[in-house]
Amino acid sequence: MRLTRLGSGSMTGRATTEVATPAEAGTFMQHQHDHHAAHSGNTDESAAPRKPKQEQEDASTEVTEVAPGILRTQLPISMPGLGHVNCYVLEDERGIAVVDPGLPGEDSWGHLVDRLARAGYVVDDVHTVVVTHSHPDHFGGAMRLHHEAAAEIVTHESFRTIFDTSDLDDHEDSEELDVNSADDRNAAMERYFAKPSPWGGRRAGPSPEFMERMRKADGSAGSIFATPRPTQPLVDGQTIKLARREWVAMHTPGHTYDHLCLYDPEFGVVLTGDHVLPSITPHISGMAPEADPLDLFFGSLRRMAEIPDVTIALPAHGHPFRDLRGRAEHIIEHHEERLDVIRDAVPDLPNGTVAAFMRVLFRERSWGEMAESETYAHLEHLRERGELVRHFDEGMAHYTPVG
């Protein structure tokens, strides 16, 4: 068993090898599921490849205690730009809670069982699953833990995924459909991607090959993408006791609307999920139903920056780090710079489409639907602030300066 425990000391002790350096915390790449786009439009494409970011590192099999009663394990994930997801194990007298139990599917489940064994636990020891937000690398194992260990599922109250069958009758047992109905699950995903983008045009969606793999995996895409149904939904400010600590729920919309962080005010520990990562920035999607997801993200980041006496931040990808305030402020500054790039481009694009502005913000190799989505989120933020006007021409959104 490879389990590294902290030495004797206070609740704020931790292994220094687990903490990101300031240099790592000052670099940026864009974290987004199924896409990892670089931001700068004028970066030299011939430059030598950079060392992979810490979030891109392959999953380690080692289990490390990062704070008393909190173990960090890593599960491999097969998403471009990401090498692992941190699955935290929170120990207490009842057994353990796990945070973000990896991707759906047998491979990830096997790795989760292995990491629990390395920590000295089995699946039946899991009494609670915390899912920080509605992306598959975070909720994948939740339903299986619920079924096999009777584990409670904790999310923010707004938790919802694209795999939800939104037009199901309220009286239907959606949990059973999640587990047993590949047809319903695939139909929900196909409906989601069949909708036109809010800035015009058809969405690419998953390839037929991807959909076929999902149908074949485990015999059912329904079981692979079983959507967690929270048994303990939290609201902002609510407390929950895990790992002998009282955690405060913090609703942190931005990366997703349903994103949840947990804060231990007594010992200054923050589980940040994908909201604040040590060296890459989370994707802010223009597909979100909210009018201005970037503004929500800014507000959530400011809340992170205001948390007093943080001793350690525990992200979903990459290494734990100390300067949560500085990192949150740096991410805000980064997006403000992206907004300035758009402002500077407006005179040259007085009636620009989302695709036109995307080409200014992103490198050519990153052009595509995901880059357009984040560009749209930034344009809508400027429109909500009264700096741009949007109109549609033949179904395509165009942006012009006010006045």
For the regions a protein language model found, what residue spans apply to each?
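Active-site HxH/HxHxD metal-binding segment of metal-dependent hydrolases
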Residues: 3, 13, 107-110, 115-241, ...
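Metallo-beta-lactamase
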Residues: 2-3, 11-73, 91-106, 109-110, 209-232, 239-241, ...
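Histidine-centered divalent metal-coordination motifs
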Residues: 130-138, 156, 253-255, 259, ...
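Conserved beta-strand hairpin/beta-sheet module of binuclear metal-dependent hydrolase folds
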Residues: 60-121, 125, 168, 261-278
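C-terminal regulatory/interaction regions
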Residues: 28-52, 56-57, 340-403
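Short hydrophobic/aromatic-enriched beta-strand-loop microsegments
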Residues: 150-156, 271-273, 331, 367
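Aromatic/hydrophobic pocket-lining residues that form the small-molecule binding cavity
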Residues: 112, 297, 375
